[in-house]
Design a protein with these regions (language model features):
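Generic secondary-structure signature for well-ordered alpha-helical cores
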Residues: 12, 16-19, 57-65, 109-117, ...
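Glycine-rich, aromatic-bearing surface loops/beta-hairpins
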Residues: 106, 110-179
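Active-site histidine-anchored catalytic micro-motif
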Residues: 35-40, 44-51, 58-77, 100-101
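Fold-independent oxyanion-binding glycine-rich loops
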Residues: 30, 38, 70-73, 155, ...
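Ligand-binding beta-strand-loop-alpha-helix segment within the catalytic cores
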Residues: 63-125, 130
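N-terminal glycine-/serine-/threonine-rich phosphate-binding loop
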Residues: 1-26, 30, 42, 46-61
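Solvent-exposed alpha-helices and their adjacent loops that cap or buttress functional pockets
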Residues: 18-20, 100, 146-151
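Short acidic, glycine/serine/threonine-rich loops at helix termini
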Residues: 38-40, 79-82, 169-171
């Protein structure tokens, strides 16, 4: 199956399963090296990144969900996102590149209308393509989401949603819709 189509299907399934809604943030970490069958960090591929970006971003944009793209470890896993998603965020001064930030972060930075790079966020859901470890950018409490699509290209796909923390103990009553 085509990489763009895999990404479209995966993000649609995640939106439905995780109940992601307008205004929410979806963080994506991606190793294009892993997608093309190489070891993470060794074969960054801008063309593959463009397919992944197009597959995910087009679905999110029509649902008014913000895309946050995690940079690689060389940029401390910083986040590329549209400024309007985080209007009061403090940006850091860096422009992602293929070998410093990664191909997907570079494509996102060059594709967004008004991109900023920030050190961290707390997203509502996430997609990890190629075991890049996105957990640091998810709200507590993260819950794994199992999708029918297990891989994007050759890369392992892991997804998560979040739920609010339970507080109050045995006497508390919880909102079932937030689980």
């Amino acid at each position: 199956m085509d990489i763009k189509i895999q990404c479209e299907q995966a993000v649609k399934e995640l939106i439905e399963t995780a109940k992601i809604t307008s205004g929410n943030i979806l963080v994506v970490g991606c190793s294009t090296s892993e997608v093309v069958g190489s070891k993470i960090g060794t074969n960054s591929d801008p063309d593959t990144a463009q397919k992944i970006f197009d597959g995910i971003y087009n679905v999110l944009k029509e649902k008014n969900i913000y895309l946050a793209v995690q940079c690689c470890e060389h940029l401390n896993r910083a986040i590329v996102i549209e400024r309007c998603a985080l209007p009061f965020a403090e940006p850091v001064n860096v422009i992602p590149q293929k070998k410093a930030g990664g191909s997907l972060a570079t494509v996102a930075y060059n594709s967004f209308n008004n991109p900023i790079v920030v050190e961290n966020i707390k997203a509502d859901a996430g997609m990890d393509i190629g075991d890049t470890f996105i957990g640091m950018h998810l709200k507590a409490v993260a819950i794994p989401v199992r999708l029918s699509i297990k891989e994007i290209g050759n890369a392992h796909l892991t997804c998560a949603r979040v739920r609010p923390k339970f507080i109050g103990g045995i006497r508390a009553i919880y909102n079932e819709e937030l689980l």
